From Swiss-Prot:
Family: Belongs to the UPF0246 family.
Protein name: UPF0246 protein BURPS668_1321
Taxonomic source organism: Burkholderia pseudomallei (strain 668)
Biological process annotations from GO: response to hydroperoxide
Organism domain of life: Bacteria
GO (cellular component) term, any one: cytosol
């Protein structure tokens, strides 16, 4: 079983990693090709492309200039420890043991606009490039065209090593990022957990809580060494509970009445 997550825009390069083990991104050459094209943009063009402020545009202009094809602990950090958004607060990888991180390395993947597909311990250099960015490039009109079927083929290569009920992709990524995967080409069942909170008289998806819950689900999978979709139904972190009546074979709905 493999669980896929979205990345985060917020990054932490201040906190030293608590593990030294690291790996190299599979699609580093593709990332370098994108960086070469991004370096042609001015800060103003970056700001317009990404709809970000002038200071953020200048920051990312400098990040692209500083980016190196060679990722080392001196210029990069393990992805799961560098990402710092809501999903990663739920995952809280900094508190995972080395054994937990080793399991995550085999079962967790992060979709990325720049890197395509990352393992938790792949070295990540600072960047910002959301998958939905309409960045025209040598391969097409946007990043979905750039990545094409590459991410899907990479996931299939890993899923083929899993047997039986464990040949499952758990989609804990956003719609923007999961669009880079071609489910019809996947040699696996896809299960999507959905997290809803009670508000204004009904259950609804609240973005902040849903993002955090995706990270909590990934942590549950890692700590529990979960390798079958049925075991996902026992997830009960921070008040969530599986609701069979709202779920089906492909979508597992978890609900809670009050905030954690």
């Amino acid at each position: 079983m493999i669980i896929v997550l979205s990345p985060a825009k917020s990054l932490d390069y201040e906190t030293p990693p608590h593990v030294s083990h690291h790996t190299q991104p599979q699609f580093a050459d593709d990332a370098a090709a994108l960086i070469d094209e991004l370096r042609r943009l001015s800060p103003q063009q970056i700001g317009t492309l990404m709809s970000i402020s002038d200071p953020l545009a200048r920051l990312n202009f400098q990040r692209y200039a500083d980016w190196s094809r060679a990722s080392t602990p001196a210029n990069a950090k393990q992805a799961v420890l560098a990402f710092n958004g809501d999903v990663y607060e739920g995952l809280d990888a900094r508190s995972l043991s080395p054994d937990d991180l080793d399991y995550a390395q085999r079962h967790v993947r992060v979709l990325s606009g720049l890197y395509g597909l990352l393992r938790p311990l792949d070295l990540l250099q600072p960047y910002r490039l959301e998958m939905g960015t309409r960045f025209s490039n040598a391969r097409g009109k946007d990043l979905y065209a750039f990545w094409g079927e590459r991410i899907t083929h990479a996931l299939n290569a890993e899923l083929k090593t899993r047997v039986g009920a464990s040949r499952v992709l758990v989609n804990c990524a956003s719609a923007e990022y999961f669009k880079s995967v071609k489910p019809k080409l996947l040699d696996a069942r896809v299960v999507t957990p959905v997290f809803e909170d009670w508000k204004d008289g009904r259950y609804k998806i609240i973005s902040f809580h849903a993002k955090r819950a995706r990270g909590l689900m990934a942590r549950y999978v890692v700590e529990g060494r979960i390798d079958s979709p049925d075991a996902l139904k026992d997830f009960a972190s921070e008040g969530y509970a599986f609701d069979a009546s709202a779920s089906n074979d492909d979508t597992y709905v978890f609900r809670r009445r009050a905030g954690a």
